[in-house]
Design a protein with these regions (language model features):
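Short, charged/polar "capping" segments at the starts of alpha-helices
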Residues: 22, 49-55, 101-102, 125-126, ...
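Conserved beta-strand/loop subsegment of P-loop NTPase cores
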Residues: 12-15, 37-47, 59-69, 87-88, ...
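Phosphate/Mg2+-binding loops and adjacent switch elements
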Residues: 1-58
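Residue-level signal for inorganic ion chemistry
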Residues: 40, 96, 138
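Short, conserved loop/helix-junction motifs that constitute active-site signature segments
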Residues: 7-8, 33-39, 56-58, 85-87, ...
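Redox- and metal-dependent alpha/beta enzyme cores, enriched for Fe-S-associated oxidoreductases
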Residues: 70-122, 126-127, 144, 170, ...
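Generic C-terminus detector
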Residues: 130-137, 143-187
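Short hydrophobic segments within beta-strands
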Residues: 15, 93-94, 139
């Protein structure tokens, strides 16, 4: 809603990923919809660490967010298991998202070793990119699971496991948002 100026707002939160502001240019020449200098109440960066360069690029006093997961669940449904239970197996991690590296980094952070299968963003999976994959386990994102779950031969592949993620936010961010809300009018 930052670009919808007619929308009444009490708080503005801008979320950047770990790549920061890219080339710093606005669409269509760059990745930004608004200039980094645009006023906002809170800046959140989804990155494993906030480097001085990243902090300077996004401006303000950013809060850190990390995506994490501890378990996976079969695409076909069933019991979820800890990611650690896949250690020692031949694993491929596949991601058809805008930044597959973030998914792969999260899995490495969970202690897994695997081969990477980056797919184009919004991949439709009709070509079954897993047919020739020699792995005991194929880990996929929740976003990709939505599409894979509609394709019968993929749902039947017992190697496919979905890795749900949760956002881990800086506790100070929630406190400051609540404090800011207390000062907002309810008109």
């Amino acid at each position: 809603g930052l670009q919808h100026y007619a929308l009444q707002r009490d708080i503005e939160v801008v979320l950047f990923d770990g790549r920061g502001v890219g080339n710093g240019w606005l669409l269509p020449a760059g990745p930004l919809r608004e200039p980094p200098s645009r006023r906002r109440d809170f800046t959140v960066v989804n990155a494993p660490q906030l480097t001085p360069q990243l902090i300077q690029a996004v401006g303000g006093r950013p809060f850190q967010m990390r995506l994490a997961s501890e378990y996976a669940e079969p695409l076909a449904g069933g019991e979820r298991v800890p990611l650690a239970s896949f250690k020692g197996k031949r694993i491929t991690a596949a991601a058809g998202i805008g930044n597959p590296k973030r998914f792969f980094d999260m899995l490495r952070g969970a202690g897994l070793a695997f081969s990477e299968l980056p797919l184009p963003d919004h991949h439709d999976f009709l070509d079954n990119p897993f047919a020739g994959v020699d792995a005991d386990v194929i880990l996929i994102t929740e976003k990709d699971a939505v599409k894979c779950g509609q394709i019968e031969n993929l749902v039947g592949d017992p190697r496919l496991w979905v890795v749900p993620v949760s956002a881990q936010l800086d506790g100070a961010l929630a406190e400051q948002i609540v404090e800011k809300c207390r000062g907002c009018s309810t008109a």
